[in-house]
Amino acid sequence: MKINGNEIRPGNVIEHQGSLWVAVKCNAVKPGKGGAFNQVEMKNLIDGTKLNERFRAAETVERVRLEQKDFTFLYQQGDALIFMDSQSYEQLELQKDFVGERAAFLQDGMTVTVELYQEKPIGISLPDQVSVTIVEADPALKGQTVTASYKPAILENGIRILVPPFINAGERIIVDTNELIYVRRANEKDK
């Protein structure tokens, strides 16, 4: 779908210079002399490079709609992660580096959303929060309750995060998969 350069908004995916780009920041600029333009900071969906580009209102760009499909994580085989399409039951193999450091949070049966462009995977979204067990945590020191302090802990998947002093090894907690931070203790519903 063609749109004018001044209609590009953050989150839009556009085709530019033969690649797919997602608009990160958009700034409408109206200089004292000359025509107005849209200053767009974009990130390449394939290799992650950034680009700043000016689009005049008269320019048109191709806005791309990505298809989003739910997949279920099945298992890991070496560096390959195997997912199954929830509707067609076809399997999809993605490399671990495609998912990034969040791959450590994948659990058997977890539902993820994969963004596809012309049947090719472009991005993946994990649930925002997951329940994990702490395998190692430093003991709480007396007197640490006065100030808001955190201590290091190691999760069952090997990721290191900071947790409040009252959290101990063996407890289940909720972790934000985007920021890799402690959210809260897990309760029975979260397991």
Swiss-Prot record:
It is found in: Cytoplasm. GO terms for biological process: peptide biosynthetic process. Pathway: Protein biosynthesis; polypeptide chain elongation. Its main location: cytoplasm. The keyword Membrane does not apply. CDD domains: S1_EF-P_repeat_1, S1_EF-P_repeat_2. The keyword Metal-binding does not apply. Keywords: Cytoplasm, Elongation factor, Protein biosynthesis. GO terms for cellular component: cytoplasm. InterPro entries: Elong-fact-P_C (IPR015365), NA-bd_OB-fold (IPR012340), Rib_uL2_dom2 (IPR014722), Transl_elong_fac_P/YeiP (IPR020599), Transl_elong_KOW-like (IPR013185), Transl_elong_P/YeiP_cen (IPR001059), Transl_elong_P/YeiP_CS (IPR013852), Transl_elongation_fac_P (IPR011768). This is Elongation factor P. The gene is efp.
